A protein has these predicted regions:
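Short glycine-rich phosphate-binding loop at a beta-alpha junction
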Residues: 89-98, 173
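Active-site-facing substrate-recognition patch
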Residues: 24-87
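Conserved acidic residues
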Residues: 92, 140, 170
């Protein structure tokens, strides 16, 4: 995504308004604004969060919060479903990555009238000890739904589980990605096509345009994204 700042610098006031409105009209920016509105995304450069991985981050995304808002929930369902229908009309089933994408995946499967399953991070330690919950058959063409992509590790682990089960993973659709190079390389190596509703660049762009953050915060966020494992240490 090209930065709006480079194009806007030498424009008239009216042209600036037009460029801002045009930038805000993309799906990535529309959804980014919606996430910011419900505080599903928090940008706190001066009071960073600690992720489960141990990374210190000025950025936190909780897409599960979208489930609490009916209109936003419907928006996510419709947009994810639209992408699956347009890009993967041959899909036989939808699989969600536990636990964050179970609800989103089920919503998409319901909208498209497709079977649904979800993939655990590890097999259950009781009962049938299933890793994949559902009724997926060998040879099925499956689209994976994920809520968030950071390093891509857990997402691609689910893909591998489905492949081991005998399914053909034809693509993954997620609500959000940080766009870390390590994730992009991992998806490339795993031969998995990834499509997302929004991304880091769109969120930062919208947050700056709407006054959620200041320009100096943008520089700090970019520093973090360039080296997230070491930032803040």
């Amino acid at each position: 995504m090209k930065s709006w700042q480079g194009s806007i610098r030498n424009c008239t006031f009216v042209e600036k308004i037009y460029l801002i409105q045009k930038a805000m009209s993309t799906l990535e920016n529309i959804f980014a604004q919606k996430l910011l509105n419900v505080k599903a995304i928090k940008l706190q450069p001066e009071q960073p969060f600690t992720w489960a991985s141990g990374w210190i981050s000025p950025f936190y995304c909780d897409n599960r919060k979208t489930l609490a808002f009916p209109a936003l929930r419907s928006f996510v369902k419709l947009e994810l479903s639209r992408i699956v229908a347009e890009k993967y009309p041959e899909a036989d089933a939808i699989a969600g990555v536990a636990t964050g994408a179970i609800a989103q995946g089920a919503l998409v499967a319901d909208a498209l009238g497709l079977p649904f399953a979800y993939v655990r991070s590890k097999p259950k330690d009781h009962g049938m000890t299933n890793l994949i919950e559902g009724d997926l058959q060998k040879g099925m063409k499956v689209v994976v739904i994920e809520d968030l992509i950071s390093t891509g590790g857990s997402s691609l682990k689910a893909v591998e589980a489905l492949r081991q089960h005998g399914c053909e993973v034809i693509g993954m659709v997620a609500s959000y990605t940080y766009g870390f190079p390590v994730a992009e390389e991992a998806f490339k190596q795993a031969n998995v096509e990834l499509t997302t509703l929004t991304n880091y660049e769109a969120v930062v762009e919208v947050a700056l345009q709407t006054g959620y953050i200041k320009q100096e915060h943008v520089e700090l966020l970019h520093q973090w994204r360039a080296n997230p494992s070491e930032w803040g240490k």
